[in-house]
Amino acid sequence: MKTKKFLLTSIFFALFIHLFSQEEFTYQLPPKEVIEIVDAPATPSVSIGSKAGKILVIENSELPSLEELSAEELRLAGIRINPATNGMSRASFSIGLSMMDLDGKNIQPVVGLPKKPRIRNIEWSPDEKHIAFTHTSDRGIEIWILDVSTRNARKLTSMYANEALGNGLAWLSDNKTLLFKGVPEGRGERPVMNLVVNGPVVQESYGRKAAVRTFQDLLKDSKDELLFDYYATSQIFRVSLEGSAKPVGEPGVIGNFTPSPDGKYLLVNKYIKPYSYIVPYYRFPQTYEITDLEGNSVRLLAEVPVADNLPQGFDAVAKGMRSPSWQSDVASTLFWVEAIDGGDPAAKAIYRDQIFLLKAPFDGEPIPSIKLRLRYGGFIWGKNDFALISEYWRKDRNTRTYLFDPSLPDREPVLLFERSTEDRYNDPGRFQTITNSFGFNVLQFDKYGKKLFLFGQGASPEGNRPFVDVYEIITGKTTRLWRSEAPWFESPVKIMDVDKMELITRRESIEVQPNYYSRLLKSKKIKQLTFFPDPMPQLKGIQKEMINYDRADGIPLSGTLYLPKGFTPGQDAPLPTLLWAYPNEYKSADAAGQVSGSPYSFTRISASSPIILVTQGYAVFYNASFPIIGEGNKEPNDSFIQQLVANAEAAINKLVEMGVSDRDMFAASGHSYGAFMTANLLTHCDLFAAGIARSGAYNRTLTPFGFQGEERTYWQTPEVYNVMSPFMQAEKMKTPLLLLHGLVDNNSGTFPMQTERYFDALRGLGATARMVLLPNESHGYRARESVLHMHWETIQWLDKYLKGK
């Protein structure tokens, strides 16, 4: 009897340990076909120097190794710093450079590059005779220079750049001087932290509202402040082409600096104490100051307080100076914007924002300029009496573009375009710019100064058909010059000659790798310039089709269907199918039904793409439309679950009707908000046999001051937050769910804890689930080992719960 009791007890504890212990697991490899796609070389990119008559061909890097991703990383004030280089961690690099003529001939590698280049921040000089770039070595970030005519590259100075707060590399308009943010000379050693703390961390609230969204990697204590100061403090240097470097001004926590177009002044943005523990560095108190090239103060423009108490709503902005910058087409005039309505979108106001101008020598009063009825969206400067300005209102998706005369600031601007940002079919495109003699971007006119040019994606019921339009300034008439034609997907890149209407485009088709072409619009001649090879020839024969269908309430939907080689719908047995989607909120049902993507784009599968499953015998319905609509006074999320299920039903019905898919073998999947969608679908319907959720958030009460497109707080609409949270309905989960998450996810709102706690709930309630946490990975997965293992997990899960049915 004792032996039997002992045996039962042993079995119980063995089962208990098996169920609740962590699995000792190593990285796994997916099938060979998947590995080959993940390891396929990246397609080169180009940078065009029209003045130089050259094209810079840029070779891009593959996936980093887990060892690279495991390097020490400091997470401070919303940023991640590599202390070895004083730059951003997890940066992507280019690994090679070549030069070629504009006619596509004479491609030659750049000589003199370091042995293992890690290139970023490529900047042409205004005259395009030189190119500056950075190379990240093991010791720091080096400044390099490339002579365009000789193709010779060399390190410019022994000083190291400081990119903790982003790139700080800028040419002066003299074409001989480069400015950069550097590590201060004599900085000393990194602060040594005392493990014994001096006291508790204290934060207080005295009735002042400070509602902020959830941010990651914030400062936590005085030790973090010391480290932030050490790595974020930089010194501006100016360096000649001969390599002689000179400091400009004093060191500080410099966010951005920009030289004036004439190269006589600098606009310098610095962050100052006291720092905040609830917002990232870019919301810290800061100053804007004009200095000369020696660093002497010309004028302190503004001291901006910490932005931790913005009014509620996406259209809320801080009081005081915003977005100061130089007017691109004149020597040295500053402009900025200030809120007239106190930054509060709930305030009743005819005008919301106002532009101010300040001209050199900056000793006068700022000149009040144009008032905007919505929020300032940006300038495109043209010439003294001609500029374009845009405004927007996110709540109702309205955007407007105006023609504005900077020389007559009191004159009412002329409305050019007004539309909903959701309405892609009527998007007029973006006005084209060129680089002027100062090295600044300005509008590209025809030779008479009477016409402008627009490039657009050309969204249509047939998919995207990129276009080039000409806009006549006097009449306001727009005429189409060119449009991409089937069976090609061709996008305009740059107008090289407005007289000849010579255009550089990027051209591709379903099975033809993207390459760059020269196209003469008048003669309709076309010439191929680059000949990049197909990186994935093994995908030849993969079938791709854009599918259109309707939701039960009549909303048009679409998605791109990928099928394995040789599969014939209606003849072959229906396939197990992965539905991949990402919900989007709309205020217009008409806009929600618009088609996105192109049926003619090249089938290039990125390393982490779910389309890779097509090599394993699955159909993949990619980027299926999942609109969540709330017209008028209705908010989209008030019917989030119902619309989510309706979208899924429509897609499944269509694919089953086509003979592509087996109704009992569907899996739902998505990343981030798509993962949130996946968990909700599996919770609230029985349409799927499995689900795979990557890097999601599942408990919306942990993002109580808004999320995604939701402006309302948890305390205003607790029922919406609770109903939308799959964590709150974890007991309803009856479908196998694979959860993946990067252990150091820094995306706002998607803490790894979201997946950990959701899995705990599912396990505690008896659901079938598996949680995979990827070490050293952020919101997207980058290490080769992680990406391959993710695919292994996905294939194992789907083979078991779809193919195994």
PLM feature segments, named:
Residues T291-N296, A360-D363, W393-D396, F404-R411, ...:
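Secondary-structure transition/capping motifs at alpha-helix termini
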Residues A91-S98, L102-G104, S598-K805:
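Active-site-proximal cap/loop segments of hydrolase catalytic domains
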Residues M1-E23:
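Bacterial Sec-dependent N-terminal signal peptides
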Residues A77-I79, P574-P576, W580-T615, E710-E711:
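N-terminal cap/lid subdomain of alpha/beta-hydrolase-fold enzymes
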Residues Y288, L334, L416, Y516, ...:
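Conserved hydrophobic/aromatic pocket- or pore-lining residues that grip, position, or stack substrates
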Residues T530-A573:
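N-terminal cap/lid segment of alpha/beta-hydrolase-fold proteins
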Residues S21-K525, F531, P535-G541, P556, ...:
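Beta-propeller folds
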